[in-house]
C-alpha cells in the first residue's frame, strides 16, 4: 500500500468483507467530484465563513474564509486567498482564479475538507440518520447546523456516545477515606 489509509482499507476489507462491510475512500476522485459546487462556493465565495459571520450563534471551532486543504504528493496544507491569488500554505503552489477553477474541475480529489467542512461532506456523500459522537464532536456538530441549512443538506440526529468511568482500587480507597462514594463525584466540586 502507498498510504496508511489504503493499508487500513485493505486490512478492514480482508477482515470483514464476508460480513457485508463496505470500505471506501472518501478522497476518491468520484466522491470529491460530487462536491465540486461545495468546494467552489467555499473557495470563491467564502460561503461558510459568511454564514458564520451573519449568525448570532458562533461555532465552537474557528471558521476560516476557506475551509479546504490542498493535497498533492504528500502535501496537505490550507488554501488561502491573497489579493488576486489562491496560495497553498507552506508551499510554492499558487493559483489564479481561472487556474483554481480548472484544478477543481480536473482534480477535485486534491481538495480535503477541514473540520468544519468534513461534517457537511460526510453527510453529502453518505447521509446518516444519526451521528454518534464524543462530547467535543457533539458540541461542534450542533454548532454547524446552520451550514447544513445553507446547503439544504440533511442534518442527522446527534447522539452522545455512551461512556464509562473506571475507578481504580486506589481511587476507591481514597474516596472511602473521605467518606465519599462515586455519586458524590458527579455532584460538582462545590457540593462535595
List the predicted regions and their residue ranges.
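N-terminal targeting/trafficking signals and adjacent low-complexity tails
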Residues: 1-192
